[in-house]
Amino acid sequence: MAEETQHNKLAAAKKKLKEYWQKNSPRVPAGANRNRKTNGSIPQTATSGGCQPPGDSATGFHREGPTSSATLKDLESPCQERAVVLDSRSVEISQLKNTIKSLKQQKKQVEHQLEEEKKANIKKQKAKRVLEVQIQTLNIQKEELNTDLYHMKRSLRYFEEKSKDLAVRLQHSLQRKGELESVLSDVMATQKKKANQLSSPSKAGTEWKLEQSMREEALLKVQLTQLKESFQQLQLERHEYAEHLKGERARWQQRMRKMSQEICTLKKEKQQDMRRVEKLERSLSKLKNQMAEPLPPEPPAVPSEVELQHLRKELERVAGALQAQVKNNQRISLLNRGQEERIREQEERLRKQEERIQEQHKSLQQLAKPQSVFEEPNNENKSALQLEQQVKELQEKLGEEHLEAASQQNQQLTAQLSLMALPGEGHGGEHLDSEGEEAPQPMPSVPEDLESREAMSSFMDHLEEKADLSELVKKKELCFIHHWRERCHQKTHHLLSEPGGRAKDAALGGGHHQAGAQGGDEGEAAGAAADGIAAYSNYNNGHRKFLAAAHNPADEPGPGAPAPQELGAADKHGDLCEVSLTSSAQGEAREDPLLDKPTAQPIVQDHQEHPGLGSNCCVPFFCWAWLPRRRR
């Protein structure tokens, strides 16, 4: 359409030029024009007024000869001038045609460049849409990652709580293991002492005691198998948790790699867009330079100003469109820069999230290391008081005839305990090594990244739970001590208020076999009662020592525990014939810096589960000074 309008305009301009030339050119006679178009022959019959009638040719010729030559000369000079003017005008017309052709070519080039720019703009818009879609996908992936992180944190908290419970159980089992080892060593010593003091008991009683000890051994074996099975289950759960963490980590790394690849492709596309923009800017600068170049000077006689003005307007319009395109390209470049900044911010956020996740894995590994140390002995804690009570009963009841059988049983118990300790330690070490190689490092009790609200709230909840647990432990310890004191007072009151004074005399003289005339059976019963009183008094004394050592970690004796000198003096006077079964365990508990809290909870649980363990009597400390006076 544009070319047709241009052709129409050129045809109209040519018509106007012809009309203008016809109006301004002087009129020439038709005969002169015809004679001019011939081969240069001068007509003889041409006159100023037209053709004359044929008359006397000779007279007419000779009569009008000088006038016709003058008129011919006068006519030839303007004709020549007009011919020159026509030649110059034809040259100018050819020049104008050439300029019009060059302008048409420039216009075609400009239109071609505009079409290319439109295509480039369309491509840029498509790329922009693709970038927006990719940004939306990145945001969706970011939200998915956040949800995955939240679920991982919840699972980590759940496993942390489990590991804390396991650590507490392991700590109690370690304590009871040391106590049992010390108890076994004390049992051997006390059995040797009692071999010299005790008389031979009846065969029926010894057989019954042996059967009871065998039953207790069977129960202990069953408990050992249960403990081993529970330990294996804990190891399997731990390995499964480590594998789960590995899978989560690998999946998260794959997502990060995909996102990094997408970011690289976006950067490449952006570089390509920038190159295209630079090319367009160069082409625009070239076009501006071409437009700024001065056109060739127009001849003054060419009347094509309307067409030139129209062409100038079209060029101005094209220049305005190009400037608008340049502005649009600049705006697109600004938008691309903003998108680049957003992408960089997203990369920084993702990097920070990755660092936080790595720190959490490291802290989890650091927390798993101390938990594996306390993992083994936790399972032995339940049967600790049972073993101690069983050893005490064996100490009181076994006689001289079955000392060898009792020593063999004690050796079997020690072998079982050593077997429990050795595979537990071996498995624990291997488990620690395998965790150090495989499992991701766990979170410490105090999180390092306290900037996030979730970490801060979880840390505060952890501290509150810890404080509540410590308060509960203290309350249970106080209740346990109060209960044991009341029970000891009741038992001693019952023994002292027994009619006939048999219990008092038996308690006083049973240890040294001073029963008198009442017979050997009463003396033996009284000696057993006295031994039970002394053993339980030592147990209470050792338990108070243990509580004092737990509350005073600086190896200072507690206010309720007696001094070592007093204990030694009491042993010299013969008050306490029995050795405390828990003194060495208490010393180990004092020396061990990991045992910050007493084992009140398992003791209370065992006492509630087995109420018959504490059926024997206990003598308080104020009765110790009374016993030697009665013996004297």
Swiss-Prot record:
Extent of Gly residues compositional bias: 508-520
One term under GO cellular component: Golgi cis cisterna
Pfam families referenced in this protein's UniProt entry, alphabetically: GM130_C, GOLGA2L5
Feature: compositional bias, Low complexity: 555-568
The entry's keywords: Coiled coil, Golgi apparatus, Membrane
Chain intervals for the UniProt region annotation (Golgi-targeting domain): 529-632
Disulfide pairings: none
Coiled coil residues, start to end: 86-154, 209-421
Residue numbers spanned by region Disordered: 1-77, 352-383, 423-445, 496-524, 550-569
Membrane topology: Peripheral membrane protein
InterPro entries: GM130_C, GOLGA_cons_dom, Golgin_A
Subcellular location as annotated: Golgi apparatus, Golgi stack membrane
A GO biological process held by the record: Golgi organization
Listed Basic and acidic residues bias regions: 352-362
Biased composition (Polar residues): 38-50
Protein's UniProt keywords contain Protein transport: no
Free-text function comment from the UniProt entry: May be involved in maintaining Golgi structure.
Family recorded in the similarity comment: Belongs to the GOLGA8 family.
Protein name: Putative golgin subfamily A member 8I
Taxonomic lineage from the root: Eukaryota, Metazoa, Chordata, Craniata, Vertebrata
